[in-house]
Amino acid sequence: MEFNDKIKQFSERVVKIKDTALTEESTKMSLIVPLFQILGYDVFNPLEFCPEYTADVGIKKGEKVDYAILQGGNPTILIECKSCTEPLDKHSSQLFRYFSTTTAKFGILTNGIVYKFYTDLEEANKMDLTPFLEIDMRNIKAVSYTHLT
């Protein structure tokens, strides 16, 4: 199956099951992890797709971002997940804290339906307050597919 077809099929799945994945954990397992698998990540290899990645903030130890995509043992993308019933507006500060303590260059905040992509375009090593890309999986268009690859 072609990538575009997989994404379209997954988008339809999101619409169908979003009302049953009510907890953060069920959102991760039914909506978020499957998308990263479609994108080509080995979600079962913690050397590539690491769950509960430690991103200690200052004196606060044990802080963990939901997932980190690793290259050579270093995080390149941090993924902070919320329940699909949770609006994302109030949660970027959590990702902001994690971003500043790691070598990651991209951060994704998602509830499995909406994906907000952040980086540090405005100031090096400091996550921008505004996402450079936002994708709603319920309304994904062919033009959005190119942003995912």
Language model regions located:
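Short secondary-structure junctions
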Residues: G40-P46
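Active-site metal-binding core of divalent-cation-utilizing nuclease and nuclease-like domains
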Residues: P46-G72
